[in-house]
Amino acid sequence: MPRADCGPGSLPERGLQGDVSAEDRNSGRSRLGYRCNMSKVGNLRGSGGGIVSATFEHCSYTGSLFPGNNVVRQPGVQVIDASNPARPRVVGSLADTAMRGGTWETLKVNKKRKLLAATSVPLLWGGGFFAVYDISDCEHPRLLNRGPGIATPLPFTSHEGGFSPDGRTYWASGIWPGHLSAIDISNPAVPRVIWQGLHGFLGHGFGMTPDGNRMFISNGLGINILDT
């Protein structure tokens, strides 16, 4: 891959792009940060956030962290309107049992079906609670499942998660052991676990091919390839 051409106002790495050298750390240069062809447009000081956030259209959804996000004025996942990027603003919060439990690396969007989903991960590992939202109106997400996953737990564990490309399945992956669950959301009002398995000693990080037929999931020492 060729080196990026960084224009005026940029602060790129002086050596290998993407690498913070020992020289930069020792000299204090790394404290200034790095940027290439990026400039700040606006900012918002909210209630803090969790590990992973998600975006759809002009909206951003800030992941929650348990228990801290439960003691702020608007608990749960913050909904941010960034239609005016110079002045983004909080327009609501998602405060169901899953979103308040800490979303860790599970808060994801499927653009094809206009869905937002997450599981409850209080600290590194969790499970049971799962929420699916319709984000057709991105500023006003609408909770679709009020029974399984919200009022009653589902039988899965999770640390991270994500949609299949078609948006009809949500995959929940527990960090240890390598526990993987497929949650059918073809009818998002009634999510149900349709498959579970152990793929390795642990799991952290997965991706899928665009056709949804293959999953690549880490196992701590390498990658497992699953036919999905």
Where are these regions (language model features)?
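Feature marking well-ordered beta-strand scaffolds used for ligand recognition
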Residues: 1-228
